[in-house]
Every structure is written in structure tokens, then in C-alpha cells.
């Protein structure tokens, strides 16, 4: 092949390749244009399918149907829903079942339906049980013979969402729904006459009978006459509460109903102002053998109606046997081994706390009632026939509750001034804190060892310059005003001390006791007159290793300094000054040192600060009380009874369960077994110390000087408040009980 032929062939190949390349580029360009058109078309289609922005947001359904719930699809509130209609499942469209909480596992699914579904289920279930049980009177009689005249509902057959749309439309919330019974609440059967031993003696016989229809079927009110879980009883419209759960809506409605009666409404106002209960704000509900009406003649039985809001009366004493019915022996036997509760009464007589042996729930097993004769009569009464029981119940008195009047709630009004203006008229001279600190110094030097005295002196010396700096510019009028502020604060604390129910003490900044509560005297044996300096202090318990000292009193040879008003240029005559007990005399050595070290930090430190720690209070013991002292462990004998409540301690016998008694008639209580004032006196009887935890803070006056020290604490099984120159701390501190 010649060179010319080769060159021509290459030229032809290049031309063909160029044409192919041009064709390829054109093809690529066409494909890209088609792709762009396709994407644009898809975007337009997507934009066309987009939701209209003006379209309102679809409301979320309260509960999806079963099919939509399994498919995780959007459902509606209507039944059948639109999706089930499109798919042809409209006949099987019903609410789905949600996962129940653990406390609802025993409740059927029908009772958890939203709105009125649960009431409709209860009504349908009650009607079905009435029809099925028309020929079974034996089962009904078995339920009636219960001593409490109610039984838990028998296990019914739940057909599970078998109601149709017609049933939902035909059923309304009317009076017939008041008889609906929740499956988790007790059933009160009223289909047959009730035995009179389960009803109130004043209830007519017709109240225990239920009218029935002509065909023998029970009436629409044959179910519950008092069902706490029935929303119709409290006029609750659960459908309007927008709750998805029957029990949640009922709980919310019950809280609202309870809140309607907490206002300060006078007792004479109508009960309807507190929220009506039942169909006509009244009903019938009787306790076993009791009638809580005003009288059996002028009023009938009621259920929390208008008559239930009337004032309580004192017409007759409470009959314990009649109140607790035939189970009185069983109740008393079960409660005989429990520790007796106690309450300290410092209010009017109608608030007096009954003695431990007077409580019907705290009687011993050997004597269930007041005496053996009553117990024998009660046992013989159980064997009498029904007519005799009816006659006896008619003759028994009406059970009444104590009368509670608003005007009788004036605690401590006999000793309290009518107003605070008398304080400003009575205070004429300032209080000598200098004499108080001198007396405190003499007491500390006499009681404590040199090492402990040095620690206390260092703590007080650290705040002495601050006291001097804050008081050097005060004149006589300022000091008088300071004392008026102190007395005014005590006047304010009077109600707190009487109402708190815990041992309370109020002291000045020198540690001198200014006020004390009755509970503190009962617990420690320190009488109020002794603590305030109105009576001599004969205490010999200083917290030593032997518990009690047989030597001199805690005062020793110390003579209180007389208070002279010459230092204030008011008079030249010296007036004897009463010396109250110091706080240091009520604590053991370690507690006193710890207190003053903390007081030095808090006196001029944080005005809102507080200290929480433990301490040991010393019991009040005289030489007569310490007549018998154990040689080895320092236990106190039976003669250690306090002046407060000592007589009651000897009245305790040793026949109760779980307790032992000493040879001199005293009782040793176990941990947590405290009964009345006598039981409180037993605290710390071994070593003369009561261990407790306490919290205290400092209250300052208008000159920013510590005025009061407030201590709140708690003894074994008993709260204690020790207020020493400060604002009371209302927080309750649990006891740190140690063996």
C-alpha cells in the first residue's frame, strides 16, 4: 500500500469519528433536556399534591380504632372511621386497646373507655346480670348476708366492645345511670330486704326494701346506692373533661369536688354551697348500728346531703358496741397490742384528749368494753333472735359527734392579752442583759471544768466586741424599746407554742428561759414556774457520769444578783430580780459547748442561717427523786417520777403486750411504745438524759442585735421545739432515736 493510500484512509476514519462524536454530544444534550423536563414535571406534580396552607390542621383523635392502631395510621373520632369505610371494615371498626398501667390490670377494658363509655358498659353489664340472675335468688342472698352488706362484684363475662352504634345513640345520661356500678368498687345489693343489724336503728323498714317491677325484675335502682366510683353520684360529666381515661377523669373530678368544701363557709350555710352529692343532694346511707342524724325523730337518714352539713351535737354519748357492730371484739383484739396514741390538751375542754384506756380501738384483750358486765351482755346479745335485736337497737341512743364551733377555737385565750397595746404600756424599764451575762458566767465556772469553761469563754469572747459596738450608741429609750420588741415577739409566739403541739422553749440571747410550752415540761420534767424563775430550782441532775448527783442543786451556793434600776437613773431602790433557768442547765456538757460555738458563728453572721445537730436534754431530778440509783449503770429507780404527770406513770400496769415492769410499778416501754404523759416521762429515765436532734436559728431586733434563739428539735418519738431568742422554725425534724 502506498503512502498516499494510507493517508486517505486515515482521513476517512477521522471524519467518521468526528461525526460519531457530534452525534454523541447531540444525544447527551437531548437526554439532559429530557431529564430536566422530567424533574420539573415531578416538582410540579409534587407541588400540585401539596396540602393547601389555608387548610386547618387535622385534630388528633382521642383514640384510634383497632385497625388504624395496628397499622399506625391516622384515625378519626367517628366510628366507623373513614379509613375503615374505604377498606370495607366499617362493621369491625371499634376503639383500639391501649396498654394499661399496672394498677389498672384488674379493670376490664370497657371500664377504661373515654367519656360515657364506662358508664354505658356498667349499665349494660348490670342489666345483663339482672336478666341472667333472675332465676338465681340464692346467689343474691349470699351477697346480702355479708356483715358489711356489700361484697366485691362477682367475675362477670365481658364481651369486649360488643355494643353497637345504636346502643350508644339510644343510651343517655339519665337517672337510670345513677345505678351504674364500677367493676373495681364494692357492690351494694339492695334487691332484697336487708337485716336490721346492718342498718341504722332509725332507718325505716321500707328503706331496706327495693321496689320491683311487675314481672319480677329488679328496678333501675337495684344496684349501688353509694358507689364512690360512679361519676353520676357527684354529677360529673366525664365527657366534657376531655380525658382519655375514665379513672383519670374521675380522679380529677373528685379533687375538684373536694376543693369546693374547703372554704371558710359558716356551718349554718346550706350544704349545696359546698357542692351537691347524689341525685337530690341527699340519699340514704347508714352505718352499722348508728345514726348520724340530728335526732331520730325530726330527720331521716341521709348521705352527705344538706343535713350532713349541719352542726354536730352532744345529745348522747357514743355507744362503742353499737358503733363497731358485731366486729367490736375482733377490732379490739387486733388493736390491743398496738402502742396507745396520745395528744396533749391545752385547748378548751371540748378538745380534751381521752385517756388511753378510754379509746374503743385501744382496749385490751382482757376487757373489751368498760366492764365485764357490759361484755357479758354484748356476748349474750349475739345469740338473740332478729326481733329482739331490732328492739334493742331501737332503744339504744343515737350516736353523736362532739360539737365543733368556730368560736370555741380560741386556744389560750384565757391567758392571752386581748391586744398587743398592753405590752407597750406595761414595759417601763429595760432588761438588764449585763446581769444575765454575769449570772451565766458564774454558772459556767461553777459547773464545767476549766478546759470546757475555756472553750465556752472563747466562743463568747469572739462576739463580745460586736455586742459592745452595737449597744454603745443606745440610750435608755432605745433599751426600753428593745424590751418592748422582745415582749411583742413573745406575744406573737404564744399561739405558735400552744398550737404546735411540740415541746417548745423561748430564751433570750443570754440563754435565760423566757417562755416554755406544756409539752416540754411533760417531756423533761422542768416545770414552767421553775424555768421562768418563779419557783426555786432544786435540780440535781447535771449530766454527770452517774446520771444524778446527790450533792447540792444546780444553783449551788450562787445567789442571783439583785437587779437595780440605778444604772438607768430611774430610781434609787433595788428591786430583787428573778433569775430564770439558763439553757445551759438543760443540756449536757458537750451539747452546751457545741451550742455556744455555733452561736458565736450565727449571732452576727447569716441572719437567715440555722444550725441542725443533736443534743441531750437533762431531766429535772431532785434529791427525793434520786432516792434509788442503780449502782452499776446509773439507772434511776421508781422514785424518779417527775412532778409533771408522775401520778399517771404509776397507774400503768404490766399486763400489756411487749412491755415489762419494774418492781416498783414502773413500766419500761420499748422503742416506739409511748402512751400518754406517763409514757413521755419514761424517756431518759435510765440516765436522766433525753437524746434528740434539734435545729435552731437567731432572730434579731431592729438594732441588728440577737434577740431570740429559736430551736426546733425532736425527742424519741416526739417532736421538740426549743425557741431561744429567734423566729420559730416550722419545719418538722424527725427523731434521731438512739438506744
UniProtKB/Swiss-Prot annotation:
This is Transcription activator of gluconeogenesis MCYG_04674. Residues 1-33, 267-284, 397-411, 562-574 have a biased composition (Polar residues). It comes from Arthroderma otae (strain ATCC MYA-4605 / CBS 113480). PANTHER family: TRANSCRIPTION ACTIVATOR OF GLUCONEOGENESIS ERT1, ZN(II)2CYS6 TRANSCRIPTION FACTOR (EUROFUNG)-RELATED. One of its GO terms (cellular component) is nucleus. Residues 547-557, 653-664 have a biased composition (Low complexity). Residues 65-93 bind DNA. InterPro entries: ERT1_acuK_gluconeogen_tf, PAS_13, Zn2-C6_fun-type_DNA-bd_sf, Zn2Cys6_DnaBD. It is found in: Nucleus.
